[in-house]
Amino acid sequence: MCKPTLKVFSLTIILNKTTAYLFGLLIFMIASISYGHGTDSPIVIKTVDWQTEQIGEIRSYFSKEVKIQRVEGKKCVTGALLNFYVRDSYAFDIDELVQVEVEFDLGKSSAEIILQYDKNGNPENTKRLALPQNGKHRWYRHTFMLERARFSGRHIGNEFGGSLFSTPGVFVNGDFYIAGADNAQITVCDITLKRSNTSPQPTAYGDLFLKLLDENGSQVPGRVGLYDTTGRMPQPGKEAVLFKYVDEEFTNVVILNSSSITWPVRTRKAFYIDGSYHAKLPVGRYQIVVAKGIEYRTLHKNFSIEADKKTSLTMNLSRWVNMPAKGWYSGDVHIHTSRSNNQDNLRIRLHAHAEDLNVSNLLQMGDNKAFYFQQYSWGKTAQYGDAPYTLVPGQEDPRTGERGHTIQLNINEPVRQPERYYLYHQVFDQIRQQGGVTGYAHVNDLTWGLGSLTGLALDVPFGLVDFVEVLQLGRASTSPWFDFLNLGYKLSPAAGTDFPADVVGAVRSYVQTGEEFSVQRWFDGLKAGRTFVTNGPMLEFTVNGKSMGSEVYVRSGDLLEIKATATINPEIANLERIQLFRQGEMLA
């Protein structure tokens, strides 16, 4: 496996008069540049009454304007993102070239078209088309060639840049989708599919029995990739763990390009198991990959399945670093998944345990009309799980494009004021009265993140903000955070995946709780600044013997002794350098 280079470690010291604030706190790998989802509308999922002999259903995501209309006798569908489900009777779980001929209405379509599909887990699954703009013809037909199309309706995934959302496939569960670039509308009036009928047809099967054990010999959940010699992952069996993507349950998890630095194969499909797994597989050679968060070594092994025979595998997981043993516990401050009963608790906690994520903040998302990803209960009684894996409800609300998206953690009950929706400070005040922790999501200096910068400028000077989410989708944005630190404001950094926009815990906040772990100590540490954010590397950092989150009082000319140690799983990356920043400028 080729090791990617660790691009940046960043430590920050903010000197304010005679106080040195230790916001060293940031350590990250830049895997790719991605953008936030950038819409304040809820995740609108609308089933459209538009079918053909081969297309059974269309769903429109993130678009309230989707509509059906007759144009010159043609039945056309218009929307920003149209997700197509192929009838199972025509094609299901295949692996072959498929031609998709699409007719566009040029008068009502974006100049650039994007088609994305499940290329049997291959990340190179995006087709782009520039529509002609000469105005001579209204109708335009184009044939997309989909190599290794799967059509299993099991989560598309992957990324492309755009102002609406960074990873549209993450929210899209279907066979393929067609979208206009930058959330522009498209109009589709006809689609015809033509199969090559070259998919391999297995004739014999064997049984796989798999167990995952941790360093103590205990059976533990984990993430599993299982691939044949072509890189294809067979559909997970019934024993795979179900989890929700927006409104549907799936077993497949998609590992985004921005999170793939810790995944040693190109295929981006995987699934979760509770520690044991049995499935029937076609005869042949396979590679298995097993991961359990970023503190464990990733395992991979080749094996064979023989006809009518049993193959048993035991994968022994081990840590390359043990952060809890050092008093540091991980958390994801930004997860969207609904909970309605204890069965949901069991499922979600198992998901977090499989990623070795200690604190999972499940955010009920709101706008000025309603809440989404609803939580069935609040407060300490709604916190589920024994240490060290706990689910904690919170909210992402208020959230607007003008003032940004806010996050409220460790709250006793949601705070919602539709009639005063832009008065964020009133929400922060009420959250503080509950003992909650307040912050801003998606804090970056790109595109729609400007809304968060406006909100921060209004709320930080009044001491209403505890943290800023600076690491997401494999990209850290330090400039806005540095600006506030340089002015003397203490703001903790935080990391959140915005699941389902990324694998839970792909980026995470580590908080120092000391020898004893509790949920309250974790949130106290986050608020106090005893934290760093990462998507793989680990950090130790002191100034004059004081650790992260401390204040060091110095005089002009005093000598500062700075000690920093950065480590990274040697199996996945090479350490290149450590950077030290002061007042936003690199010192070393």
Please annotate each region the language model reported.
Residues 176-184:
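Short beta-strand-plus-loop segments that form exposed binding edges in beta-rich domains
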Residues 194-207, 213-217:
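Beta-strand-rich domain onsets/edges
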Residues 103-109, 147-149, 567:
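Solvent-exposed strand-to-loop "edge" motifs in beta-rich extracellular domains
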Residues 108-119, 574-576:
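Beta-strand acidic-aromatic groove motif in beta-rich domains, primarily in extracellular
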Residues 272, 293, 299, 324-503, ...:
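Catalytic cores of extracellular degradative/oxidative enzymes
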Residues 212-248, 252-279, 285, 290-322, ...:
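C-terminal functional module detector
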Residues 37-91:
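Glycan-recognition and processing domains
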Residues 122-167:
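Extracellular carbohydrate recognition and processing domains
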